[in-house]
Amino acid sequence: MTIFLSMDIKPTELDRLIGDTHPEILAHEMRIMMRLTKFILPHLETLSTVIKLCAQLDCLIAIAKTCKENDYKRPVITTDKIIDITNGRHPLQELCINNYVPNSTKSSMDSSLVTILTGPNSSGKSIYLKQVALIVYMAHIGCFVPAEAANIGLIDHIYTRVQTVEDISNRMSAFLIDLRQMSLAIQESSTKSLIIIDEFGKGTSELDGLALLAACINNFLFREDKVPHVFVSTHFQTIAQYLVTSYMPSPYLNF
């Protein structure tokens, strides 16, 4: 049996006029890319430096623009052990609501270094903790801060236990991650560190969570004048009676 294949006049005409256009385009693109690569390689180090400088300039312009538009103030950086913020604001939260209430913060050897916040859900505890951490961080990167005034002592590390999502791929529950974060903060923190602890102990029973949180806070209090800046929020209303201050008053604790 003989089979004849015939092409319509229109496809034949297109094949004659256009041909293998797409492969030719790809080949031409490849030639251009190879020429560009050959041109760039000798100047790669210079281009990399220029890109980094442009990125830094972009960041500085963005910081300056944000500070000017939102009336940020220049913080005072000191070597003293102090975090003193007057009417601080959360840099993102204040953009989302019209009636944001500023909050002041004082953590120093003369006031207290361990601050515990208690209160109902949605009362602003987490926002306040994040606000403190963000203002301290912004001051350390050379940025103005959202506050009327700020006196920030140099911080060597910021440790946080704020929000945890379980890591199934590594077989770690949210509570296990919480414990590891707290362990890191306790073992690695120094007198110049800032530690933010938000609702630690929710991933286990109420009794165990209360005991763990009290033990962690007591660990910091036992350091006395070496205690870092610690800010804690908790829903455990009875936490005070489990702290060392219940029988041995400490000048470093504030509720």
Tell me what each language-model feature is:
Residues 46-69:
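Interdomain "pre-motor" coupling segment immediately N-terminal to P-loop NTPase/helicase cores
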Residues 4, 63-255:
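ATPase nucleotide-binding head domains, primarily ABC-like/P-loop NTPase cores
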Residues 15, 22-25, 29, 58-61, ...:
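A structural signal for well-ordered alpha-helices, especially hydrophobic packing surfaces
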